[in-house]
């Protein structure tokens, strides 16, 4: 991403959305709406002073609402461009004109409340839709106690808890009392392979990311007792099954074939009850329950499909054919990554490479007609 941001032949439009797409392959015209950042990205040094002085707290969406940020902020350290922006929905200056602390304290004079939305018209040859995936609806999570019990968390929230740059600086603790964990349960296939929520497909990534998160947790605390409740183990990918077996042996992860119907709270702990393959009823208490969320279609998939003139399948992902999995239903429009269907990062990167080759073939006649070459002054050898 950093390399792409530095390339003179790649233009990154942030805070932007596609509004229209007209024309034919090789000669598309895209109408783009770009929202203002209210901070000049050329002047901003990302020092963080504006965030420090801003009196308006907001939930940090990047940290899965587990920490607090401010109206002027940067989503994460490696964000492109490496500059802050102001959330217009919560900024006191934009909504009520009652505050100007960020502008008064910015030594780079980067705050610019005069910025307005822009309408852009772009001449393009091909379109690649890489919208990513959407989140499972919260109503699916609620039957497991999510939202009622603080120690029932999603896999994304647990990922941030294990991260050194996360809200707890990598210390895995109970959210209810901030005490260290002793027992963790992972529940698989939450929002996947479940016709009651309309998602009958396997999300393909949940088994392996649960194994990874459990392994990371054991590296943080070797005394943790971790149980993973699977309906079926589907570690899809080259060498993934062997990697799963190594993790189970190395860290002593317990793999239990059962589908948990609900989560109860007993004396401050979380109670799980299940039936084994042999009909035996079991129950156990845990300090934290992690819900391994499946991958949903992007929430704006329908709107983008109407604008781009493409079709979606009955699950809301981009409709493609078996023999052309990277080609959408409109000529010149391609798809890559989880918008085509649930998949992991390596497969998404592979698809992106394939799409780049197909787009390059489509535009072969005009190749290198708009490229820019960086020139450097000659070295002074005297």
Where are these regions (language model features)?
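Residues forming the flavin
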Residues: 1-382
């Amino acid at each position: 991403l950093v390399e792409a941001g530095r390339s003179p032949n790649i233009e990154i439009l942030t805070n932007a959305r596609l509004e229209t797409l007209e024309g034919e392959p090789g000669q598309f015209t895209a109408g783009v709406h770009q929202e203002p950042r209210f901070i000049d990205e050329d002047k901003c040094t990302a020092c963080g002073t504006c965030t420090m002085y801003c009196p308006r707290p907001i939930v940090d969406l990047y940290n899965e609402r587990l920490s607090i940020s401010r109206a002027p902020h940067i989503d994460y350290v490696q964000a492109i461009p490496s500059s802050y922006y102001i959330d217009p929905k919560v900024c006191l200056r934009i909504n009520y004109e009652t505050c100007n602390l960020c502008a008064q304290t910015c030594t780079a004079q980067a705050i610019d409340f005069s910025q307005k939305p822009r309408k852009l018209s772009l001449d393009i040859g091909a379109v690649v839709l890489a919208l990513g995936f959407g989140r499972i609806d919260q109503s699916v999570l609620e039957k497991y106690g999510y939202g009622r019990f603080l120690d029932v968390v999603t896999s994304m929230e647990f990922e941030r808890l294990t991260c050194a740059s996360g809200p707890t600086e990598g210390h895995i603790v109970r959210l209810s009392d901030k005490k260290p964990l002793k027992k963790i349960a992972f529940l698989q296939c939450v929002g996947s392979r479940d016709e009651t929520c309309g998602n009958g497909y396997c999300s393909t990534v949940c088994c392996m990311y649960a194994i990874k998160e459990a392994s990371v947790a054991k590296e943080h605390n070797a005394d943790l007792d971790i149980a993973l409740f699977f309906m079926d183990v589907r570690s899809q990918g080259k060498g993934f099954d062997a990697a799963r077996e190594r993790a189970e042996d190395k860290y002593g992860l317990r793999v239990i074939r059962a589908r948990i119907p609900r989560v109860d709270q007993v004396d401050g702990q979380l109670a799980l009850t299940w039936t084994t393959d042999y009909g035996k009823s079991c129950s156990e208490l845990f300090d934290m329950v992690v819900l391994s969320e499946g991958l949903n279609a992007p929430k704006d998939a329908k709107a983008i499909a109407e604008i781009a003139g493409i079709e979606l399948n009955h699950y809301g992902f981009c409709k493609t054919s078996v023999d052309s999995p990277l080609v959408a239903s409109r000529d010149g429009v391609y798809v890559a990554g989880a918008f085509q269907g649930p998949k992991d990062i390596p497969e998404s990167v592979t698809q992106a490479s394939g799409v780049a080759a197909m787009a390059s073939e489509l535009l072969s006649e005009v190749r290198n007609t708009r490229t820019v070459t960086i020139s450097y002054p000659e070295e002074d050898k005297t």
